[in-house]
Amino acid sequence: MAEFDARDLLDCYARGVFPMADAREDARVFLIDPERRGVIPLEAFHVPRRLARTVRGDPFEIRIDAAFHDVVLACAASGPGRTETWINRPIEQLYLELHELGFAHSVECWQGERLVGGLYGVSLQGAFFGESMFSRVRDASKVALVHLVARLIAGGFTLLDAQFMTEHLAQFGAREIPRREYHRRLDRALAAPADFYALGAAAPSADGAGRLALQLITQAS
């Protein structure tokens, strides 16, 4: 892995494969191209009713790329129901390099100056590859996901790759598709330009950001 750098990782994403590790302290990294892939259709993203009320109330200040490394570390930390993580130190470093190059981003939920939840992923043309999320208070990662989807819709993205299908993601409309179909969608997304900062860069969200996010999602459906 010593010669494998961020540019190599970008090439992997463009081919439809992504990195994983068995544990935080295991330095080995392997690449995955699942037979079935989890995706979240942006045009069919579902916001559960209770979550929509929460988002509309703007319980968190949403920041973009303000504390990327802290988000990755929080996602890599063990917690209730998660004793191990696939984010080892070589993978952590690769994502930091991608962030420096402008390809990896975080959506963060803040209460005052406390980071309480968020997610991060990789942006490449019209595709966004969601990597991991975390919450320190109720609904924080879910709110971050809603704001991510709104940002992707505004920026002209066509693919949100969730990697693996989970019951948690199913509530938002995620579904599983065969590898061949995934690669077709990926090829189309990579041929389309998109702008992750269409809703603005690293400035904190303004009042009404939740309503705007829900409006963008509704208009796309």
From Swiss-Prot:
The EC code for this enzyme is 2.3.2.6
For molecular function, the Gene Ontology terms on record are: leucyl-tRNA--protein transferase activity
Looking up InterPro entries in the UniProt record yields:
Acyl_CoA_acyltransferase, Leu/Phe-tRNA_Trfase, Leu/Phe-tRNA_Trfase_C
Q: Which reaction does it catalyse?
A: N-terminal L-lysyl-[protein] + L-leucyl-tRNA(Leu) = N-terminal L-leucyl-L-lysyl-[protein] + tRNA(Leu) + H(+); N-terminal L-arginyl-[protein] + L-leucyl-tRNA(Leu) = N-terminal L-leucyl-L-arginyl-[protein] + tRNA(Leu) + H(+); L-phenylalanyl-tRNA(Phe) + an N-terminal L-alpha-aminoacyl-[protein] = an N-terminal L-phenylalanyl-L-alpha-aminoacyl-[protein] + tRNA(Phe)
- Name its GO BP terms in alphabetical order: protein catabolic process
Transferase is among the record's keywords: yes
**Cellular component GO terms, alphabetical:** cytoplasm
Q: Pfam family of this protein, just one?
A: Leu_Phe_trans
| Record keywords | Acyltransferase, Cytoplasm, Transferase
Annotated localization: Cytoplasm
The free-text function statement in the UniProt record for this protein reads: Functions in the N-end rule pathway of protein degradation where it conjugates Leu, Phe and, less efficiently, Met from aminoacyl-tRNAs to the N-termini of proteins containing an N-terminal arginine or lysine.
Q: What does the sequence similarity comment in the record state about its family?
A: Belongs to the L/F-transferase family.
Q: What is this protein called?
A: Leucyl/phenylalanyl-tRNA--protein transferase
Which gene does this sequence derive from?
A: aat
